Design a protein with these regions (language model features):
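N-terminal start-of-chain detector that recognizes signal peptides
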Residues: 29-30, 57-62, 99-105
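Fold-independent oxyanion-binding glycine-rich loops
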Residues: 12-15, 20, 34-35, 42, ...
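A conserved regulatory-domain signal marking ACT and ACT-like small-molecule sensing domains
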Residues: 66-163
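Glycine-rich phosphate/pyrophosphate-binding loop at beta-loop-alpha junctions
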Residues: 1-4, 41-91
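Active-site-adjacent helical/loop segments in soluble small-molecule enzymes
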Residues: 1-53
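Charged/polar, solvent-exposed surface patches and flexible loops
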Residues: 4, 19, 23, 57, ...
Length: 163
């Protein structure tokens, strides 16, 4: 039916919708539901077509559970390239975590998740590490530090079922 009625469909990434939900909430305390944020989230993709034209977006907010705001923020940070998850293989010796914090993280980086189980009789122990960056551009430096200081790691952001 939609093919007969609609001119075209446009997909908007979930993380972009989440970022769009947070913007009016943070700036003006306006609560927008995901469906209500879709039209605003899509505007960037049509900037060339709508420049100089009057555009109306219908925004609604009644179908939003405030308990989901943390999840919405998480997805927004992932989309914006500000949150990254890794499996980091730590040497099983005192001081390994301190070295990680001192050498790998930048001054504005924050560990937001850390799950580690010490393994006995093993030289290396894996940990799930979530890192929030202040600036998207800091990601390349973070990865360069992993390599420079020989920390074994696996990036997980491409598969969110892993974290």
């Amino acid at each position: 039916i939609w093919k007969e009625v609609l001119e075209k469909m446009h997909r908007v990434p979930e993380g972009k919708v989440c970022s769009t939900i947070l913007r009016p909430y943070n700036e003006d305390a306006i609560v927008v539901e995901p469906a209500g944020a879709l039209s605003i989230a899509a505007l960037d993709d049509f900037a060339g077509e709508i420049k100089g034209k009057k555009v109306v977006c219908v925004i609604s907010g009644s179908n939003n559970d405030i308990d989901r705001m943390q999840e919405i923020k998480e997805r927004s940070l992932l989309y914006e390239g500000l949150k990254h998850y890794f499996i980091v293989r730590f040497a099983q010796r005192p001081g390994a975590l301190k070295e990680f914090v001192n050498h790998i993280l930048g001054p504005d980086d924050d560990i937001t998740r850390f799950e580690y189980i010490q393994k006995h009789n093993k030289e290396i122990g894996p940990a799930l590490v979530g890192i929030e960056l202040k600036y998207r551009e800091d990601y390349d430096k973070l990865v360069a530090n992993f390599k420079k200081y020989n920390f074994q790691f696996t990036e997980l952001n491409k598969d969110d079922s892993l974290f």
